Each structure stands twice: as structure tokens, then as C-alpha cells.
Amino acid sequence: MPQHFHTVRGPHQGQPILRAGEPLNQAQAAMVMVHGRGATAENILDLTVELDQPGFVYLAPQAAGNTWYPQSFLAPLASNEPGLSSGLAAIANVLAQVAQAGIPLERTMLLGFSQGACLALEFVARNARRYGGVAGLSGGLIGPDGTPRDYPGSLESVMNFW
């Protein structure tokens, strides 16, 4: 059964982070799982039945009102604020908890579905580092065609599934 772990700030303030798998302080690897619009953190954690990797902790932040941002992922970035920035901060918050527990980014994956995939992919693009992997299930980078994508860093060594 998922457990409440930590809350986030911003428009998603007061929303829990649910956990499945190993306790965070005992895990060797982590997967941050980001739910889609209209779904819940508990819904995305249902995938852990299939993923079920020994030594993994699965962490899923919950969006306020079950949506990370109000418009389509192809809408102008400004029209998805403040939810977009708050959602990105929620992912950063979960990753900070994972790092504090001693799990390196190289052993941390991000997985998102639909709107959650868009948010996870956008986070990784803006915060390029050597993650353990990224899986974007039915999603893409946020913003219309022509949105500047000159983010610093590289994702060359990251396993990606999108």
C-alpha cells in the first residue's frame, strides 16, 4: 500500500508524495513516477506491480486537482503557469529527497504518463544530468513549435524511452 511521504510547495502545496516498494532509506535505486491529467499518484503506482524491481523505491507526487497544469502541453508556456513551474518544483523536491537518502541520480529514473510524461520530460530537458533513465509514456516537451530549447547540460548518457 502506498504511503504518504512528503509534501510539495507552490500551487501543489499540501499534496502528498506516495511511496511503494522499499523504504527510501533502504532502497538502492529510485523511480519518480508522475501521473497524468485526471489520474492520481496512487494510479501511477499501480504500475509498480509490473515494474517490481528489487531494491527500488517508487515515489509519486500528487498534483492538486489531479492536473499539473491547466492547458494542453502544446499551449504557450505562460498559459500553463503557475502549475507548470510548481509541477517542475514538485519533481525537484522528490529528487532532493532521493538524493538526501543517498541514492545518486545515476540510480534514479523518471517515468511519466501523458501529462506526467510531459512534465517529467520537460524537467529532464531543463535539468540535464546523468539520470538512471527517463521514460515518457505518451508525452513530449511542453510548449508550441518554436519554443526555445537551449537548455544547458547533456543527456547523452541517459537511457531514454519516449
Across the structure, where does each feature detected by a protein language model lie?
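Gly/Ala-rich beta-loop-alpha elbow adjacent to hydrolase catalytic centers
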Residues: L111-G116, A120
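A conserved short beta-strand
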Residues: R129-I142
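Alpha/beta-hydrolase-fold catalytic nucleophile elbow
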Residues: P61-Q62, L111, A135-S138
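Active-site signature of alpha/beta-hydrolase-fold catalytic machinery across serine-
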Residues: D46, E122-R126
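Hydrolases whose catalytic domains are alpha/beta-hydrolase-1, hotdog thioesterase
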Residues: L119-F123, D145
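The feature captures the conserved acid-bearing segment of alpha/beta-hydrolase catalytic domains
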Residues: G140-W162
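Serine-hydrolase catalytic machinery in alpha/beta-hydrolase-like enzymes
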Residues: F5-R107
